[in-house]
Design a protein with these regions (language model features):
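Short, surface-exposed beta-strand/loop "edge" segments at domain boundaries and coil↔beta transitions
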Residues: 14-19, 73-79, 99-102
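ADP-ribose/NAD+-binding catalytic cleft of ART/PARP-like enzymes
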Residues: 1-33, 67, 71, 110-115
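Active-site and NAD+-binding cores of ADP-ribose-processing enzymes
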Residues: 78-119
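Generic surface-pattern signal
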Residues: 21-24, 51-58, 104-118
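ADP-ribosyltransferase catalytic core
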Residues: 4, 25-37, 41-93
Length: 119
């Protein structure tokens, strides 16, 4: 049986709509100024970003979503986990050119865990 890892992705409105348009099966290509795709390991960290940052950001539409998805662990084994701040701020740095390969290794649908809006 294939081993899976659960990851989280905090996104704003535009990225959420693109994921939704894929029937919650894949993440959209990165923009030219976004060379890295950053999925995070901890739901709490993803929630912090979606709630505390995305809801204050105009380019996120003042909305933050936390998405959860499962990826084949074998795919992730080619990437290091980076700690960016405190010990629970752990994320993978996947180069934009490898995002399609990540999408091919997602198992099942991408799920919406939570939604936050600026008050």
């Amino acid at each position: 049986m294939t081993e899976l890892s659960t990851l989280y992705r905090p996104v704003g409105q535009a990225e959420f709509e693109l994921v939704r348009d894929s029937d919650f099966r894949s993440f959209p290509p990165r923009l030219p100024h976004q060379p890295i795709f950053y999925p995070v390991i901890d739901e709490q960290y993803a929630t912090q970003i979606a709630r505390d940052w995305n809801t204050k950001d105009e380019t996120s539409g003042f909305v933050g979503y936390v998405l959860r998805f499962s990826v084949r662990t074998e795919f992730l084994s080619h990437y290091e986990i980076h700690i960016v701040g405190s010990s629970e701020h752990q994320e993978y740095w996947i180069p934009a050119e490898n995002l399609q390969k990540l999408n091919e290794n997602i198992v099942g649908p991408i799920e919406v865990v939570s939604e936050f809006r600026d008050k």
